Amino acid sequence: MKTNNRDLPLDQFIEFALYDKVNGYYMKKNPFGKEGDFITAPNITRVFSEIIAIWVVTFWKSLGSPKKFNLLEFGAGNGEMIKVIIETLKNFPECFMNCNFQIHEKSDLLKEKQQLNLKSEKITWIEDIKKIEQNLNFAISKEQEIIEYSPGSFEYLKNICNLIKKNDGGILIIDYGYLDIKMHETLQAIKNHKYSNILENIGETDITYNINFDLFKKFTNQFDELSSIISNHKKFLTSMGIVQRAEIISENLTFSEKSDLFYRIRRLIDEKQMGELFKVMLIKKKKNKFKTGFEID
């Protein structure tokens, strides 16, 4: 890509197309849901976010139920996931009362929507993750919040890894990607739930890419005190009991409501849909042997 007769690196082009203050895709429209260009896992069914919340509680307990900790979500979209997480954690009062909920959001438009959707909750929006309070830290990154390969993405990951080294905790990364050592060309644009030309309608289409999780794993290996585990959507969510949770919920549903719920669950775990394509990665300290959600080989 060239601008003003000079080459523009791909990561800078994506940053401009998505986050330019005036023309960026995420700066001027809501991309989520039927009226947007794509649907994310938390918007398919709230059960997904409930499962993530239960995982957070389990991880928190494995670390000795610390009295203060930060739960940070990178790019909260319309705020639906962290909203459900907060609602679920209220069933675990000790965990809820000791948690500082935080969001790191680049888009001013989405930040406004999040603040409206979450106005009754105790949430802090942060600009610089280096300025997070010096407490135990949990971070959640989902769907396209870390670039496929760019200096910026690894700078984010480096900052989080340093926080984990210093304060303990971990980061849960959920995204579509692959584990091959060989790099894949996966860049694509999406508009109205359909593929589009990446160089057309810049600022009007979402740009997506599959994460190379092998690169993330190698990057993590540079930190002697840290380790990582990788699974996929199907194995992680199944191990965490998403089907059993859906069965409990469905007991009080009509036949059509029950059918719709299990259709949505299948969408998350079916290998031909999100079950295999989406990966789940946990980065934590080596001394922490926690593997909940990652037991299935």
Stretches found by the model and what they are:
Residues 135-297:
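Long, Lys/Arg- and hydrophobic-enriched amphipathic alpha-helices
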Residues 1-74, 78-130, 241-244, 249, ...:
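Rossmann-like AdoMet
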